[in-house]
Amino acid sequence: MSSSYRMELDKWLASLDVKADMVLDIGGSQLPVRGRTKTWVVEDYKIADLPEPHIESPKPDIEVDLNSHSSGLEHDYDIIFCLEVFDYVYDPYNAFEIIKLGLKKGGIAWVTFPMMYPLHQPIEDDALRYMPSGITKLAKAVGLKIVQMIPRRTETDAIYNAFRTERMRCAKHEDHNISGWIVEFTK
């Protein structure tokens, strides 16, 4: 069974209408966006991923490593999806630059960011978690504009209750049942 974190993303994707000439799915080898949205009217769809993304995953159309300074993105995409990738990114500034480089002016990038997620496989690649202010600062630094930040909420209050039990000082007047973000950027 999928995690509530994944189910929240799938629910959001199932409500999304996608209509574009060119769409890039960064990290999409394992679980492509195509086939998961409400509607899909796309002329040219490409997957960009690591050369050997996952065991038994298809090879990507374009080889891209968001932690590397050579991107391989040479097109202006109308829409870029980068879902469930940023927990493996240890150079987020570079990753933001690559997304900006691939996005056409006025295009949209949908990117997910984990805020709370346990260490997971492959553990040697699991790197970072993101807070809203960090996402905002990275976007501003590379010249991307945030259109919206959609919170991904936990199903229960268990995580917040764990913070309280451990006497961690949570910021007042904030929702501590948010486990991550779905962010819409534009160039």
What are these regions (language model features)?
Residues 79-85:
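A short beta-strand submotif of the Rossmann-like class I SAM-dependent methyltransferase core
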Residues 1-75, 79, 179:
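Conserved N-terminal segment of class I S-adenosyl-L-methionine
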Residues 29-33, 52-53, 68, 86-87, ...:
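Short, solvent-exposed loop/turn segments at secondary-structure junctions
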Residues 90-98, 108-187:
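S-adenosyl-L-methionine-dependent methyltransferase catalytic module, highlighting the catalytic core
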Residues 25, 82, 111:
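Redox-cofactor binding/interface segments in oxidoreductases and associated redox assembly factors
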Residues 54, 70, 89-90, 139:
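Activation segment
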Residues 18, 90, 104:
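Short conserved AdoMet
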